């Protein structure tokens, strides 16, 4: 091999290492990589395969490094807080509760929409946050409460404007086969996770158009990665993701930026309490047909309920990555369209997009939690 070829090979390896490292960091951190960076990695690989000249190789490496540095620096360009007003739904607990506190500490004017204005979550916000934070009664499935919240927000902000709306309110269900989930649970999930978000968005968009602000919708990795036993929840998050993607294109002409957050597994109250699990189990069993009873059995449902503590144990109790990404989506001059906070969340999304279906199904089946066997499929000894 000639010295020239050797030098070109080492340069290609160095560039591949830089770009590959960038992609890996994006997978580990959950931050979406700009599409240009992904394309850049592919183009670089193609250029290396074409055995370009040493001069051209050096030029492309310089351009690649410049673009990566430029994209990285532009992500860090944050707008001043200036007491910007932000509405957060689902602030009773979990992401919404933590975000309301976090934004209040940063100096934002926060409107915390809660399901129960007299509940412990709302009381804690009133107790520990500044006077800039207002707690609003806001069940996103009740149009009259959304309308009332809109009136109160408009009255308080007056000419200052509303900078951002964070649609975070959401519900989960007992993890179980889609065949066993009653239609009432499907409807409830859709009412809160999708229609609630759409209704809040439609109500507050006139204010966001005036401020040329931000619409941040909290979806889920489950809306992209097909996880078993989550059909009702995942379907609503998939619908929310598509709604957010399309409305992002539509609102671009108004200067409103729309961002979708797709968290991985975090420990929040969305899975509910023991009482809620028991009620869901009873509701599922009450809708059992004779065929379902014979093929699945009641113990199958009970075993599925026992999986929930395992899910919580495997979830990350530190929601800081989610809060950090939402803050960035609100404050960055050029936010990403998607954020994937969580352990290897972006990697799972990539697997769902590019992995062969049979292999993806196998990985999901083996990689999350043990599946009980329905009564009719159990081996009789």
Swiss-Prot record:
Residues at the catalytic site: 233 (proton acceptor)
CDD domains linked: type2_17beta_HSD-like_SDR_c
Catalysed reaction equations from the record: 17beta-estradiol + NAD(+) = estrone + NADH + H(+); testosterone + NAD(+) = androst-4-ene-3,17-dione + NADH + H(+); 17beta-hydroxy-5alpha-androstan-3-one + NAD(+) = 5alpha-androstan-3,17-dione + NADH + H(+); (20S)-hydroxypregn-4-en-3-one + NAD(+) = progesterone + NADH + H(+)
Residues at which NAD(+) binds: 83-112
Lipid bilayer topology: Single-pass type II membrane protein
Residues binding substrate: 220
First and last residue of the signal peptide: none
Domain of life: Eukaryota
Entry annotated with the keyword ATP-binding: no
Family annotation (InterPro entries): NAD(P)-bd_dom_sf (IPR036291), Sc_DH/Rdtase_CS (IPR020904), SDR_fam (IPR002347)
Keywords, sorted A to Z: Endoplasmic reticulum, Lipid biosynthesis, Lipid metabolism, Membrane, NAD, Oxidoreductase, Signal-anchor, Steroid biosynthesis, Transmembrane, Transmembrane helix
Cellular localization per UniProt: Endoplasmic reticulum membrane
Enzyme class, first EC level, given as a word: oxidoreductase
Function: Catalyzes the NAD-dependent oxidation of highly active 17beta-hydroxysteroids, such as estradiol (E2), testosterone (T), and dihydrotestosterone (DHT), to their less active forms and thus regulates the biological potency of these steroids. Oxidizes estradiol to estrone, testosterone to androstenedione, and dihydrotestosterone to 5alpha-androstan-3,17-dione. Also has 20-alpha-HSD activity.
Family: Belongs to the short-chain dehydrogenases/reductases (SDR) family.
Protein's name in the database: Estradiol 17-beta-dehydrogenase 2
Native organism: Mus musculus
Lineage: Eukaryota, Metazoa, Chordata, Craniata, Vertebrata
């Amino acid at each position: 091999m000639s010295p020239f070829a050797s030098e070109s090979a080492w340069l290609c390896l160095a560039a591949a290492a830089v770009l590959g490292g960038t992609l890996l960091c994006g997978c580990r951190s959950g931050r979406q990589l700009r599409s240009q960076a992904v394309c850049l990695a592919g183009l670089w690989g193609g250029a290396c395969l074409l055995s370009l000249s040493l001069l051209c190789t050096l030029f492309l490496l310089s351009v690649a490094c410049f673009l990566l540095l430029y994209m990285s620096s532009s992500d860090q360009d944050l707008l001043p807080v200036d007491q910007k007003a932000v509405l957060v739904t689902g602030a009773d607990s979990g992401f919404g509760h933590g975000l309301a506190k976090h934004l209040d500490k940063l100096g934002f004017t926060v409107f915390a929409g809660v399901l129960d204005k007299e509940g412990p979550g709302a009381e804690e916000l009133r107790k520990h946050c500044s006077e800039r934070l207002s707690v609003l009664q806001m069940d996103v499935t009740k149009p009259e409460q959304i309308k009332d919240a809109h009136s109160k927000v408009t009255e308080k902000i007056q000419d200052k404007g509303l900078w951002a709306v964070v649609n975070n309110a959401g519900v989960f269900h007992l993890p179980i086969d889609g065949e066993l989930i009653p239609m009432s649970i499907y409807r409830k999930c859709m009412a809160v996770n999708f229609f609630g978000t759409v209704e809040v968005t439609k109500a507050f968009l006139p204010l966001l158009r005036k401020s040329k602000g931000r619409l941040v919708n909290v979806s889920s990795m489950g809306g992209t990665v097909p996880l078993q036993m989550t059909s009702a929840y995942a379907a609503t998050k998939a619908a929310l993701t598509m709604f957010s993607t399309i409305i992002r294109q539509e609102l671009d002409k108004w200067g409103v930026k729309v961002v979708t957050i797709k968290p991985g597994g975090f420990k929040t109250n969305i899975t509910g309490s023991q009482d809620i699990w028991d009620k869901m189990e009873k509701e599922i069993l009450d809708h059992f047909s004779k065929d379902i009873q014979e093929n699945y059995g009641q113990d199958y449902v009970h075993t599925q309920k026992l999986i929930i503590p395992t899910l919580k144990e495997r979830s990350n109790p530190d929601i800081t990555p989610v809060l950090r990404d939402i803050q960035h989506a609100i404050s960055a001059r050029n936010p990403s369209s998607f954020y994937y906070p969580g352990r290897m969340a972006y990697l799972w999304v990539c697997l769902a997009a590019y992995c062969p279906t049979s292999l993806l199904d196998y990985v999901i089946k083996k990689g999350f939690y043990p599946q009980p066997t329905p009564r009719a499929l159990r081996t009789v000894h």
